[in-house]
Curated annotation (Swiss-Prot):
InterPro entries: Rossmann-like_a/b/a_fold, TilS/TtcA_N, tRNA_Cyd_32_2_STrfase. It comes from Psychrobacter arcticus (strain DSM 17307 / VKM B-2377 / 273-4). This is tRNA-cytidine(32) 2-sulfurtransferase. The thiolation reaction likely consists of two steps: a first activation step by ATP to form an adenylated intermediate of the target base of tRNA, and a second nucleophilic substitution step of the sulfur (S) atom supplied by the hydrosulfide attached to the Fe-S cluster. [4Fe-4S] cluster binds at C176, C179, C267. HAMAP family: TtcA.
């Protein structure tokens, strides 16, 4: 049984009439120009892609949507499609399991992916999965109500990881690491059960930058969150389609969409988290130097192993000269006495006798410090 077949049999989502009409007419509306959503041309043909996307989405867009909202949505749509294309995140026939926590990031991810699914030149399925970790006070009815209202196929996976985290993490320590590992393990196993070929997480560009600095400052490593990751057992593929998206745009998008946000009462209530400190630092940088974060993120995509000091990443031990000894002018390692004339004969510059120059001297005639021109000295060969 293929992943797509398994997915179809296990989900029975409800759709409104507008969604059905849009899906029925999808292939009729798809043109060659729409394929530029995943085109790898340098200019990305954004205007053409947006024109076609606007035509497809026109029949379902609300007249009350402001131009400001549509502009922001278009920006996110572009950035997510670029990330999908650049890292080959989603392929034809994929079943994408979107992990929805109830936070702004995962809501935005799900919303944009559903939007792209309707205009993409390839076919892929989306299923939303929420992991109910049994945190005290967790409003377990919020997400199912929202997903049902939107007609989105979904699962609610119930696992009491909260009690485990509380029991194994010492008092005063952060829960994030243990919680993340337990959550990841649960989602990995469930993805295989439903035949999902990709697991989409809602981490954005600023999450990746914060993780980079956390590892740099506290872990002694140059590493972050990759946009695409194969699990250690090679059984699951993680993707982060929001890799190019800034958090401030997600905050604004979630506000305009009025997503029913569910706060994290497990780690969100802890104080003095190192990640929170790093996030504050990044926000201060962004306010004072608007291009700094973009430059740092660009650097993460432009690594020069030979310019660092990781012996596992670059083979420094076997570095050797590739010089032709026949090109040497003289025998021995250094120019010997009596060979200066030979240098002059072949036109190479010859250094004058050693000169001692001290710029901090006083002009005795004027009794004041007078700058003197530094004499030109030919380079020593």
């Amino acid at each position: 049984m293929t992943a797509a077949t398994l997915f179809t049999q296990q989900t029975t989502p409800q759709f409104d009439k507008a969604s059905i009409d849009t899906d029925v007419n999808h292939h009729a509306k798809t043109t060659a120009i729409e394929a530029m959503l995943y085109d790898d041309s340098d200019d990305r043909n954004d205007d053409f892609m947006d024109e076609q996307a606007d035509k497809i989405l026109a029949d379902t867009q609300s007249l009350t949507e402001s131009a400001y909202f549509r502009k922001l949505q278009k920006k996110l749509r572009r950035q997510v499609s670029w990330a999908i294309r650049d890292f080959n995140m989603i392929e034809d026939g994929d079943v994408v399991m979107v992990c929805v926590s109830g936070g702004k990031d995962s809501y935005t991810l799900l919303d944009i992916l559903l939007l792209l699914k309707r205009i993409a030149p390839i076919h892929f399925d989306i299923v939303a999965v929420n992991l109910d970790q049994k945190q005290p006070g967790y409003p377990e009815e919020v997400l199912p109500a929202y997903l049902n209202e939107q007609g989105i196929a979904h699962y609610i996976l119930e696992k009491d990881t909260y009690s485990i985290v509380k029991s194994v993490v010492p008092e005063g320590k952060t829960y994030c690491s243990a919680c993340s590992r337990l959550r990841r393990g649960s989602l990995y196993g469930f993805a295989k059960q439903i035949g999902a070929t990709k697991i989409a997480l809602g981490h954005h560009r600023d999450d990746m930058l914060a993780t980079f600095f956390l590892n740099l400052f506290h872990g002694g490593a140059l590493k972050s969150m990759p946009p695409k990751l194969l699990s250690d057992d090679k059984q699951n593929m993680l993707i982060r389609p929001l890799a190019y998206v800034e958090e401030k745009d997600i905050i604004e998008y979630a506000r305009l969409k009025e997503f029913p946000i569910i706060p994290c009462n497990l780690c969100g209530s802890q104080t003095n988290l190192q990640r929170a400190i790093i996030n504050d630092m990044l926000r201060e940088w962004d306010d004072a130097h608007p291009q700094r974060l973009a430059s740092i993120f660009k650097a993460m995509q432009n690594v020069a192993p030979s310019q660092l000091a990781d012996r596992e990443l670059f083979d420094f031990e076997t570095l050797s000269l590739e010089r032709d000894d026949n090109e040497r002018l003289f025998e021995g390692d250094n120019i010997q006495a009596g060979q200066i004339e030979s240098l002059a004969e072949i036109g190479l510059p010859v250094a004058p006798a050693t000169q001692i120059f001290n710029p901090n001297f006083v002009d005795t005639e004027k009794g004041s410090h007078t700058p003197k021109k530094i004499p030109t000295i030919n380079p020593v060969i």
